[in-house]
């Protein structure tokens, strides 16, 4: 009806249409297994994050890479316009060499991806992490499915973690379970460099005369 070809099996796709790559768009606990099924068929895979949920699964995926098979994992947060603009300023050196960042923008693997981007962490760089999850009473407002206006209060989790990288750079991850949708829990970002800092959408830095600019 709309010109999209449908098939009844993965084997039919491979043998009849010989795709350039397969897009894996399934629940996150199935991404790894489905990706490996297509890699086993010799098909390049494009998947979203997370590629896997544990180290054993990640190591299995890495073994495919070492054999020359390819999986591309799409991470979208670095491409958000405001984040992309912030990264551009930092990479241009406006605040100098970056030493630390406080990232409260996105959960788990998305947040860690942003930490690596803002600090310029090298692939494979070792780090030490310590973390703790707290629970605080919070007035409920919006969820993915509902809107609450009766003032109900529930315990909501907040995870705080410190990442210390072997380069000496440090990041603090801070994320509240209500943060994506609640109007009373807002995102925030702070990145410090030797010549200034970026806080949300403001940059404080020194010019060539070492005068402070905003």
Where are these regions (language model features)?
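Single conserved hydrophobic/aromatic residue that forms the stacking wall/gate
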Residues: 1-8, 12-13
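Beta-strand-loop-alpha-helix segment that lines the small-molecule cofactor/substrate pocket
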Residues: 12, 19-21, 27-79
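Glycine-rich phosphate-binding loop signature in dinucleotide/nucleotide-binding domains
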Residues: 15-18, 94-95
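Short glycine-/small-residue-rich Rossmann-like dinucleotide-binding loops
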Residues: 26-27, 175
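A structural signal for well-ordered alpha-helical segments within the folded catalytic domains
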Residues: 32-36, 84, 106-113
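Rossmann-like NAD(P)H-binding beta-loop-alpha module
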Residues: 81-99
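Rossmann-like dinucleotide-binding domain that binds NAD(P)(H)
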Residues: 97-186
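NAD(P)-dinucleotide binding in Rossmann-like oxidoreductases
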Residues: 167-214
């Amino acid at each position: 009806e709309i010109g999209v070809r449908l098939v009844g099996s993965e084997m039919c796709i491979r043998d009849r249409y010989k795709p350039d790559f397969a897009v894996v768009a399934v629940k996150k606990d199935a991404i790894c297994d489905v990706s490996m099924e297509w890699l086993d068929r010799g098909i390049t895979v494009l998947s979203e994050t997370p590629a896997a949920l544990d180290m054993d699964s990640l190591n299995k995926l890495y073994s495919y890479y070492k054999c020359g098979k390819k999986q591309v994992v799409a991470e979208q947060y670095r491409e958000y316009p405001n984040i992309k603009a912030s990264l551009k300023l930092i990479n241009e050196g406006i605040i100098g060499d970056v030493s630390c960042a406080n990232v409260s923008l996105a959960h788990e693997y998305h947040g860690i991806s942003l930490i690596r981007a803002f600090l310029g962490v090298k692939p494979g760089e070792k780090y030490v992490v310590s973390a703790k999850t707290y629970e605080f009473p919070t007035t409920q407002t919006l969820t993915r499915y509902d809107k609450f206006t009766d003032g109900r209060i529930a315990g909501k989790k907040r995870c705080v973690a410190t990442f210390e990288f072997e380069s000496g750079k440090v990041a603090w991850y801070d994320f509240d379970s209500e943060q994506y949708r609640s109007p009373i829990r807002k995102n925030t970002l702070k990145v410090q460099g030797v010549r200034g800092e970026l806080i949300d959408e403001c940059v404080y830095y020194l010019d060539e005369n070492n005068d402070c600019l905003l």
